Amino acid sequence: FFKGLDKPTIYTPELKKNISLTNFEAKEFFSDQKINSNELFTKSNFYLVNIWSSWCVPCRDEHPFLLKLQNENKVKLIGINYKDNKKNALKFIEELSNPFDKIVSDKNGTLSIKLGAYGVPESFLIDQDKKIVKKIVGPIDQKSYSKIIEILNETN
């Protein structure tokens, strides 16, 4: 009976390797101009797409790791601001600093769902061919940060 207590209760499906990211359109966070995914994914071997919100406490916890990844300069960071109030999101970035190269808005959550996200925060490591290499459900922590760096170092 007690063995069942050790099993995780949250179901997170495993990511199948080499799934290609589909093209999408979104609004650029700061300007509200429409932007195509082809414009986001240029001139980098790797991209980290991070889905976040100002109201998400674990998003605050992972923020220092996003800043560290920005400083590594081996990956382009793309933020997707999920179901958020723009004023609160701007305050979040102002307070904690902006690690992202680009941010797009996802006010109703459809873009995040299309990408295969189940909540916030979630992150996708994507290669230059727009293939998803790694999916991180939940906040980036030391373990997932180290795994991302390991993947980036294997190819550089």
Q: Which residues make up each language-model segment?
A:
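Structural microenvironment flanking redox-active thiols in thiol-disulfide oxidoreductases
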Residues: 60-97, 107-113
